[in-house]
């Protein structure tokens, strides 16, 4: 079955298209719990791409996404969706089937990165340091400690610190998880220390950011103005800085990521290099005004508009 007349040959990059300027569909919103963050990311990227001279259409992704893409006829998709359906391989599979070049990682890497336990398995196989974790039933977690505190409970397949519970060392009782938590959750040993993160663009690690907060780096700290303070480049020892850069690139490759990814760490400075722990890799990092990836790109000389343009020009199928 042939694709629509605007579909590209698989593997073709947008920069090779004959249409000038390229028409870009920015996917945003969607039905996940991270909808609001996605709207902010998508709107910011759409505005930046227009400033860069692209013909942009914004699509709030829903069940009619395929039909809306056919109507729009884009040269490429900039995927600014966050959370389930948008960054877990589902939308990527639709775009592959339709033959529409798209940004970020492909089906397999997206699905693997969204599954925190399986991505950890890939990190371990690549020789990267992670903390112990188990998959447990939410009902069992509510009944008693499934791991010696301190530990963290989180959905196995959500991002942006949505639904994350920190159980302190002195906690007498188990966490009372909300009823909207999935039936199975990840329970992970708490990694103390400083919050560090590194973005990879293509095959290049950009820099390291030290994320300073007054407490737990939760959803509000990530996305609300003033919720956290970013020190970039991070003021940390050179060997730890270099390890973050190395680990982020290795994690990117271990999952098979493409385009842009961001890897988060915890560093216990009392333990030196042995205290650096890889937490997770995000295949579609936030692109809001307070987001880490645009900030890191700016430090390396890449404006927000140029970063968005790079992602569009990098778009392809068979990712």
Swiss-Prot record:
Residues in a coiled coil are none
Q: Any idea where this protein resides? A: Cytoplasm
**Pathway, per record:** Cell wall biogenesis; peptidoglycan biosynthesis
Where Mg(2+) 2 is bound, by residue? 280, 282
What's this protein's name? D-alanine--D-alanine ligase
- Residues at which ATP binds: 147-197
Does the keyword Ligase feature in the UniProt annotation?
Answer: yes
Per the record, the gene is: ddl
């Amino acid at each position: 079955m042939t694709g629509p007349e605007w579909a590209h040959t698989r593997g073709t990059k947008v920069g090779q298209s004959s249409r000038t300027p390229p028409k870009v569909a920015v996917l945003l919103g969607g039905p996940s719990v991270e909808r609001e963050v996605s709207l902010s990311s998508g709107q910011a990227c759409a505005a930046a791409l227009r400033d860069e001279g692209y013909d942009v259409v914004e699509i709030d992704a829903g069940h009619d996404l395929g039909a809306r893409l056919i109507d729009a006829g884009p040269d490429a998709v900039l995927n600014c969706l966050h959370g389930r359906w948008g960054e877990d391989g589902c939308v990527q599979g639709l775009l592959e089937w339709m033959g529409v070049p798209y940004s970020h990682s492909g089906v397999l890497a997206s699905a693997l990165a969204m599954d925190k336990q399986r991505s950890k398995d890939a990190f371990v196989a690549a020789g990267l340091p992670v903390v112990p974790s188990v998959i447990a039933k939410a009902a069992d977690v509510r009944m008693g400690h499934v791991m010696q505190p301190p530990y963290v409970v989180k959905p196995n397949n959500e991002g942006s610190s949505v639904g994350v519970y920190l159980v302190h060392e002195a906690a007498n009782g188990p966490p009372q998880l909300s009823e909207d938590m999935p039936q199975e959750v990840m329970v992970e040993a708490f990694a103390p220390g400083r919050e560090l993160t590194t973005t990879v663009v293509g095959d290049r690690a950009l820099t390291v950011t030290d994320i300073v907060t007054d407490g737990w780096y939760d959803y509000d700290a990530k996305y609300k103005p003033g919720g956290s303070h970013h020190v970039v480049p991070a003021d940390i020892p050179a060997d730890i800085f270099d390890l973050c850069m190395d680990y982020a690139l290795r994690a990117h490759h271990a999952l098979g990521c493409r385009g842009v990814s961001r890897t988060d760490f915890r560093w216990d400075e009392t333990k030196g290099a042995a205290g650096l722990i890889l937490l997770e890799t995000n295949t579609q990092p936030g692109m809001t005004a307070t987001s880490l990836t645009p900030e890191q790109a700016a430090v390396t000389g890449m404006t927000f508009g140029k970063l968005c343009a790079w992602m569009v020009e990098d778009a392809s199928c068979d990712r």
